[in-house]
From Swiss-Prot:
GO cellular component entries: GET complex; Golgi apparatus
Name assigned to this protein: ATPase GET3
Gene Ontology BP term (one): tail-anchored membrane protein insertion into ER membrane
EC numbers on record: 3.6.-.-
Residues forming the catalytic site: 57
Entry similarity comment: Belongs to the arsA ATPase family.
Positions with a binding annotation for ATP: 26-33, 243, 270
UniProt-listed CDD domains: ArsA (cd02035)
Subcellular compartments: Cytoplasm; Endoplasmic reticulum; Golgi apparatus
GO molecular function: ATP binding; ATP hydrolysis activity; metal ion binding
Enzyme class: hydrolase
Gene assigned in the entry: GET3
Amino acid sequence: MDFELEPTLESIIHQDSLKWIFVGGKGGVGKTTTSSSVAVQLALAYPNDEFLLISTDPAHNLSDAFCQKFGKDARKVEGLSNLSCMEIDPDAAMSDLQTQAQQYNNDPNDPLKSMMSDMTGSIPGIDEALSFMEVLKHIKNQRAADDGSESNAIQYKTIIFDTAPTGHTLRFLQLPATLEKLLAKFKDLSGKFGPMLNMLGGGTNQQQDIFSKMNEIQKSVSEVNEQFTNPDMTTFICVCISEFLSLYETERMIQELMSYNMDVNSIVVNQLLFAEEDDCKRCQSRWKMQKKYLDQMGELYEDYHLVKMPLLGSEIRGVNNLKKFSKFLLKPYDPKVDKALVFELEEAK
């Protein structure tokens, strides 16, 4: 390319049309800190709009990052009133689903109900499925707002996902396309076998309810699929550290995301030492290795926003510390000017 893209996330923060932002990468590279920082900057940039940060990682860290307890329902961040957070809880969600299912079947001794209760907690991919249900819920609220329907639900300008490590995230992002195909097949089969089931007797109204619900879900899933593959509405921010394994996994993830037609044009590189003028030999040696992989990333991702974030002297916890750290997503870190901040973070309460 003849020009280098800005090494910041400014284009994402100020892209007014974005509805969904995914933040993902290998385990332990700083996804939660990055997603929290993105959410904080969005909330600061648009003080009159509401934002939601959702953790889809089974091992949640949002409560630790903000020093505030979050759960399965969206809760406002203390000190940032237009940002809410929630952590997907599979156990609580499955309990809610079973309660809803009782309206169709009140028999407590039903072996099928008992079997489903035992199975759901251990189904592979249940976290991804529940996260997707949360997406469907917000799509429904979005549609109600567009139609002018009355809704008590908060309308979020943008929803940010603090995702699980790469494999879980890729499974989650495959769900819309896979579900759309499955529901189309189901619709086709129900058209063929529906009359036969009616002839066998009973359950006509219940069948109509089920088919109506399936049509509604199919419409929402198609809408999700459409929005997730629209670069004006959805983008993915890759997070990594400057090491071989992380770089390798980032490349694999980008190739996979491109195969889903998902927009990805930003990479955040965390935990950089910037140790040119440091007397510590270990730091200099580590920085030399980091620079080698940074150079490779610069060549490999010249048409990406490559954001370089420093390793700080203490943990980045609490809204005030996140505000300080997240500024470097918009203004590149300069070790000569900003070095003092590395050791200036407040002690998390």
